């Protein structure tokens, strides 16, 4: 479950926050326009976050990865944005 403290890591200047609740967060990166759906099923372990990603609103989501916390997931999204904006290379 995402707490109100967890949700504070979502910077509204960096992300367009589409929806949030106790188990799900949907955001769009203002830098790349990519959409991210973050789900916390609390199973098999509390704190697990499954990260889904899509490039356009009309595209389907694909699983991008997992994180231990919402903050860790957001760091990964920002890292992905840097990679994307750098011509998809490090």
Model-predicted regions and their roles:
Residues 3-7, 52-90:
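Mixed-charge, Lys/Arg-enriched low-complexity segments
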Residues 15-17, 25-27, 36-38, 49-52, ...:
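Hydrophobic beta-strand residues in large extracellular and virion-surface proteins
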């Amino acid at each position: 479950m995402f707490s109100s403290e967890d949700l504070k890591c979502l910077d509204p200047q960096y992300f367009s926050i589409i929806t949030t609740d106790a188990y799900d967060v949907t955001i769009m990166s203002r830098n790349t326009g990519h959409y991210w759906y973050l789900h916390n099923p609390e199973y098999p372990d509390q704190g697990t976050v499954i990260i889904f990603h899509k490039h356009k609103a009309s595209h389907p989501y694909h699983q991008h990865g997992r994180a231990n916390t919402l903050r860790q997931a957001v760091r990964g999204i920002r890292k992905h944005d840097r990679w994307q904006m750098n011509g998809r290379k490090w």
